[in-house]
């Protein structure tokens, strides 16, 4: 019964992506069923077409790509032909674009020259994030249903040897104001699949993400999307098979709509982590997550906030002591299967010592959170618990609501861990504290 539902849901999303190839200039009309927090600007029509040349012999095609972009910038369409493979071995800064479409019908493949990419990929100034390219400007669309391949296997193996290497992100959407991304197939990213930074009014529609390691070395940190310092973003109608957050709202993400996603193998749809860097102010507000299927994952709804004292999860992930707020966050309608936590809210992220976390509570507040209409079954890994809502102090969490949460463990239990939170606002079975 579950398998039938999963297959029908996934195939439905893929069908949505396929029909999106009839590209719509009206981004607002393309959004549904929910509409974005603010109207998305309409894309202008294009009046010329440029086809990208390819060497066809494994040689770097970056010069051909830049030539076509310059030729068709300001009102044109650049086509990556269906029967061609395009090799990118050069870091491309494409933030100069305006009123242009990139129609990807063929395959774009990044080289596996790890020394070059570590030295030349674009450093984004957040959590060691680097990108193969930077796509930005104004009214830029990238669609067509073709494939973008990050050649990730060499990076998965290298990261197993040295977890401080700089692994490029497949899609760097940097400084884009007005754009549509998708439909596209994204494969084998070395790290995140999307890093959306300093951008606004962007629609992601019909993205098919997949790429697992073919060796014993896992593909790690392969988030589907990370938004950062970005506003009015829509992510919808997509299928994500990965090994980390399906979507993650990083610092200063505002007015974000996520809807109609099928996530498999992920760490959930996450706010944060936030408060990682001392003396920095992180804000995430006005986020609506709707109609999600989450399978074989660690979490569904997740809010991750660092405590007020420094702590460390690993050599490349440590911090705590930052301030800010999480406000007006809604998770509405989710089907889960084999997920460890249906809901996980913590202000002790990275700190295993709960006593120390409570002694130095987070300076980042969580308020006005609504989680509703969840159904399904957990993995049972946390039996008898199916969720956890743990704040570091009652003064730093307020107005957290849950309703219609019909989630059980395989054994039929539905217990929650609740700490420093107003249980009268929760419709769940709080039976334990984090102590």
UniProtKB/Swiss-Prot annotation:
GO terms for molecular function: galacturan 1,4-alpha-galacturonidase activity; polygalacturonase activity. One of its GO terms (biological process) is cell wall organization. Residues 1-22 form the signal peptide. Residues 32-55 are annotated as: Disordered. It is found in: Secreted. Disulfide bonds join 246-263, 391-397. Residues 45-55 have a biased composition (Basic and acidic residues). It holds the Pfam family Glyco_hydro_28. Its main location: secreted. Its EC number is 3.2.1.67. This is Exopolygalacturonase X. It comes from Aspergillus tubingensis. The gene is pgaX.
